[in-house]
């Protein structure tokens, strides 16, 4: 079973019970499983296939229109830009941030090829968490490990991004007195 890293602090029996409590879904290539900003009450586990996690941002592009006879107008054109954050394969979970925070989803998740996922209802999970404090501790410890790993990965990716332009802070010159 490839779910060892997802719920690694749970026993095999507990992991299987979680998966068995969920609804299995098959999604065709290109199918959106979760849309950014949606309310989600549960967690998905990838059983087979691969999903793409994308974060969309609103952008405004400016264009000069109606040029002619020395006249032009600046028009703002709203749009959306999606950035692939990562891909997740067999055994990976998604929707966990929304579950933990009880907040809208932070990304769109799309099937790369045909995918099978299990959706574990949040009410089912919360009932188990409320009824078994030991399970709750192991469950949240497992989520913390997953989230920590993803944060480390994001930090590594961010190291390659360098700000440019006049707003880039410069290191302080030790020879110069500090402004007070």
Where are the model-predicted features located?
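Cytosolic regulatory regions built on CNB/CRP/Popeye-like sensor folds
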Residues: 1-180
């Amino acid at each position: 079973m490839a779910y060892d890293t997802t719920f690694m602090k749970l026993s095999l029996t507990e992991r299987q019970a979680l998966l068995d409590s969920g609804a299995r879904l098959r999604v065709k290539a290109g199918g959106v499983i979760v849309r950014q900003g949606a309310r989600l009450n549960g967690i998905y586990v990838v059983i087979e296939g691969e999903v793409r996690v994308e974060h969309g941002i609103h952008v405004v592009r400016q264009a000069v229109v109606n040029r002619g006879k020395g006249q032009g107008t600046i028009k703002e054109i709203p749009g959306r830009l999606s950035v692939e954050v990562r891909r997740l394969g067999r055994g990976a979970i998604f929707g966990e941030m929304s579950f933990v925070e009880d907040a809208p989803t932070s990304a769109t998740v799309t099937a790369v090829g045909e995918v099978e996922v299990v959706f574990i209802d949040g009410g089912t999970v919360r009932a188990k968490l409320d009824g078994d404090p030991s399970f709750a501790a192991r469950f949240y410890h497992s989520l913390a490990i997953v989230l920590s790993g993803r944060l480390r990965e994001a930090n590594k990716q961010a190291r390659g991004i360098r700000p440019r332009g006049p707003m880039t802070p410069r290191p302080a010159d030790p020879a110069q007195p500090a402004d007070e």
